[in-house]
Amino acid sequence: MAVLAQLEPKAVFHYFEEICGIPHESSDTQAISDYLVAFAKERNLYVRQDTLGNVIIKKPATSGYEDAPVVMLQGHMDMVCEKTDDKEIDFHTQGLDLVLEGNVIHADRTTLGGDDGIAVAFALAILDASDIPHPALEVVITVDEEIGMLGAAGITTDDLQASYMLNLDSEDEGQLLVGCAGGMTAVCHMPIVWEACNLMHPVCMQLSVDGLLGGHSGMEIIKQRANANKTLGRTLKAIQTAADIRLVLIDGGKKDNCLLY
């Protein structure tokens, strides 16, 4: 039974649940891209899928809106996939396990992919509807936004005529946001010299930091939440003032835009 079947608007949550059932991690979006193409073809809509996997779907204007400017609805099909250590899931082959608690939707011990699955769901609901008046629509769903906006950077626009674009990737329903969050990725290589441990009676210990709030770097970065990597670094520095220690390995984080918790 569908977990979100009773939520309104039904069409939006129907498509969101379908999307959640299809693996769509960044750089692994072929299945969701093909799903969008099949959706369009089943409804005899114009569709173009490029070599990157970006999908463009067009729907003609409804009666009375033929002369209105063309509007683009834009979102991305990929999601950030993260899980707790005790969750067994293969993001490349399995969909998400959805949980509905009151009016809150979350996934069982994984990220949900509401960013930006809800945009795709809204767009599909509008494309499928016969009772929503609208101008001519161009729905542009890109790949690999979460790892550098690679799909948007590589898409060609020869067949796009939209005068207005609505990017469906903000956080607050009912509000229009003018602006965006930027991002920068840096790769640092630090030369190190390995040395043998010369302590008399060394004891190997493992330290871990978890249970923090985490969050999305595009929204929560300004809230000054604790970062597990930084917290661990400060802890090691404090220990170093009181004990003779050697660092064997430090490891933390898998996604650039997921605040380490």
Model-found features: residue ranges?
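Structural signal for hydrophobic packing residues in well-ordered secondary-structure cores
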Residues: 20, 40, 44, 81, ...
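Midchain, well-structured core segments that form catalytic/ion-binding scaffolds
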Residues: 23, 94-97, 101-106, 110, ...
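Short secondary-structure junction motifs
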Residues: 27, 134-136, 242-244
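Short alpha-helical patches at coil-to-helix transitions and adjacent helical residues
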Residues: 33, 116-120, 229
